């Protein structure tokens, strides 16, 4: 049984006046790994306190020498690692040298004997990383001979050489792969340049091992190390030496080296250098010759991957990676006649690998197929009207790839991933269910497969048609019928909408829709019908162009959707409503005009039978249905006819509304009836759906219910407040009170939706705003219970200010009187309470700042100070959306002041230095790293104001504002970060002025300064580059979207703007 740990006993460890008790430390470390409860907490607390002690590192050597416990030794290394990462620059030089020599001697001692090295693998890996951390701080300035030292030592002992390879590999990764954000840009560049300039010694060592060593483990680790070097070393070391030949002819055929060698070849294949084209082609040819010996012509890749060993599975993965990387980068080089057989062999391998039932392997292949078909589409631009056979003659590259691409088409259609719109799925138990959680990976895979299949269809639409028609026939005749086969086929059919020319699409879809409708009648059983229904709905929803051109099909499809709205199988009604609204948006005007051979418009039929259509739908589905019908009515251009349609359209909800209002006018307590309140909430949601679709035209319905709705709002508010006064705040959780809150929220939602869509600001201002402000502002202000205040009031006001702009400037003081101080009082105690009020409060502030800035200049100074303080409070939030909003408000405020010079000077005198102090406090706070781009924009603007003498008032006791701000900022930083040298601060402050006209450079300057601060405080810097990652992704997405718009069928029809769709 383990001995108990006492706090007195453990406290001895923290007494640095005594000799360290190694046995006691071992005991405490063991408690951490074996004990529970209070003993565990005590042990963890002691070890953490010891680790954080500034002198703890001085005990590391004793621990490593005398402890017999590997866990204790690892703990000691963590202490050492921490001091290197956080305090290296403040340690005396002799102590740095001592630590360096000590770590090197430990590594040599542990790695010189292969048996000892194997026994201490984890310990040694930690030592290696500690050495790399030292190198990042010492090399090359304080350790010029490091490369020659490590290379020289490697020649003395194979075991030592193995470990030195690991150190070099780790160093390469740290400098070239992970340096961003951990060391300053200048330091990173210096390390990279040094490593490149001294690489010849490392290369000689690697080559010597690979050519001469008989030690398999050493060869393997050398290949792993070389793999890390290949993406940055000077290209001459790869192409002007025997390196590639050694890899291909010496190691690729050896099973234990095969995978790492293929990885090396993939890394080389990913390089680009036009002057080495011949070398690349030779590399490909030689590798393919070797692969034929290894893989053969007819290996069943799927079987190997499914039933083979880990090594064999990895081979399939690495083979895919090599072929895809090479062909994507250099495929055109090997289209030459002398390499064409090798290219065909490579393509056949890729087709076989594409059939492997593993998503990650398939994604690798998909990326290449996508790049190939996109390149063929773009590089040999063609007329879509050209016959397929002629097309093959005109475009030789397409002719060459055609047989392979036919196989790829078949695979894409057979494996098509599930689109986001499909809600009915087969689960892992073989049951047909509604999908509730979106699978992001599946959606992304679908988008990539869809794009690839669209290109494939453009390249040969006849072949796509042939494969799909054959597969559909096999579904209908039952020879291949299964849920999976039908799903993948229909998902593929839906994915190529717009890729056929219109005539081909018509012929193809007539067959598809008829066959699917027939299949729905033919198959029995609810599960079968649910799967077939979901596929019909997905396919028809993807082809609005076809439906617009073929009225009979459009009517048949919509009637089929109405039929599905009565089908109670999970997910079918949802999909029916979702598909209906998509079709309504894209085909809206065809429903409001009389079509050939019809007695009336289809919208008339829908409105006449609406109650029977929606009788089996859930409330949320009814709202979707109403929104869909609203889009149809919005297409009616005759206002008189449109008003008549709206009246009929809203007849059902209005009947219930009128009944409730009538009964409430006789007895106001009726508005406490649960059924009535629930109905009111649902009716208001229906109105919101109608308003979204109708836009400004909804005004006729809004006018009908507006004043009654505001009265209901007031009474409901009174009822909530009374309930809270009698029963306490927890009454908010009772169903009736919750439903009352829904009524208030939906009232505000409805007003916000309509105002944001209205096209007559004066009409809104004159007729709707006065009663609205009287109703909701007074209610918000009077409510003494913060939790009962409706946050939607704030966001509604923000939307109204954003829409009406200068029209509402005169009302801003009234709005602020009602909501500003009472809300600020709710959110200024901490950063967490009332999150929705918090966000909406700043949305309102942002809207007023952007559109009614004069209102800020007209409020008393005391109230403006509250506004300013609330903005500062905003950007101190760790909630990123609130912090960003605060920074945006501040920057816009500074820009607005530029238009009001008199007010600006007074503002600068009062607030300028305060803003600097507050911004620097968040810039240097690690929880605000994501705000760095906005911090840089604001600070650069402020420093440019000072430098360009835009501030004429004195900011401090020194007449020259520039000198004063330099001294102020330097003093601010020096007092906050005492470990910084005067020179570091001086260089930083000088840069703030020198770079204030270049925001990007200014931001990099800030970032380097943050790295210097964190380097000495030991904090993680990896998040400093978050914005770059986000911006790069956003730019990539934008460019891709622009490209997709130019290729027919590439965008989902529902992503196209209206002017490109509803013709």
UniProtKB/Swiss-Prot annotation:
The record's tissue-specificity note reads: High expression observed in the developing embryonic brain, hind gut and posterior spiracles shortly before dorsal closure; and in the ventral nerve cord, midgut and somatic musculature shortly after dorsal closure. Expression increases when the tissue is well developed.
* Domain spans labelled Importin N-terminal: 43-109
Major location (coarse): nucleus
Describe the inactivation phenotype: RNAi-mediated knockdown results in defects in nuclear export resulting in accumulation of RpS2 and pre-40S ribosome in the nucleus. During oogenesis, mislocalizes Nup358-containing granules to nurse cells and abolishes the formation of annulate lamellae.
Record's bilayer topology term: Peripheral membrane protein
SUPFAM superfamilies given for it?
ARM repeat
User: Which subcellular locations apply to this protein?
Assistant: Nucleus; Nucleus membrane
Disordered: annotated span: 1034-1063
Q: What is the effect of changing residue 412 to R?
A: Results in lethality at larval stage. This is reversed by removal of one chromosome copy of Nup214. Fails to export proteins containing leucine-rich nuclear export signal (NES) from the nucleus
InterPro entries cross-referenced by the UniProt entry: ARM-like, ARM-type_fold, CRM1_repeat, Exp1_repeat_2, Exportin-1/Importin-b-like, Importin-beta_N, XPO1/5, XPO1_C_dom
Q: Provide this UniProt record's keywords sorted from A to Z.
A: Membrane, mRNA transport, Nucleus, Protein transport, Transport
A molecular function (GO) held by this record is:
nuclear export signal receptor activity
For this record, an example GO cellular component is: nucleus
Further information in the entry reads:
Activity inhibited by leptomycin B, which disrupts interaction with the NES and RanGTP.
According to the record's subunit comment, the protein's assembly and interactions are: Interacts with Clbn (via its N-terminus). Associates with the nuclear pore complex via interaction with mbo and Nup214. Interacts with target proteins containing NES sequences such as actin and dl.
Per its database record, what is this protein's job?
A: Receptor for the leucine-rich nuclear export signal (NES). Binds cooperatively to the NES on its target protein and to the small GTPase Ran in its active GTP-bound form. Involved in the export of dl, RpS2 and the pre-40S ribosome from the nucleus to the cytoplasm. Plays an important role in nuclear pore assembly by mediating nucleoporin condensation and biogenesis of annulate lamellae. Required for the function or maintenance of certain tissues such as brain and gut.
What is the name attached to this protein's record?
Exportin-1
Q: Which organism is it from?
A: Drosophila melanogaster (Fruit fly)
Source organism phylogeny: Eukaryota, Metazoa, Ecdysozoa, Arthropoda, Hexapoda
Q: What gene name is given for the protein in this entry?
A: emb
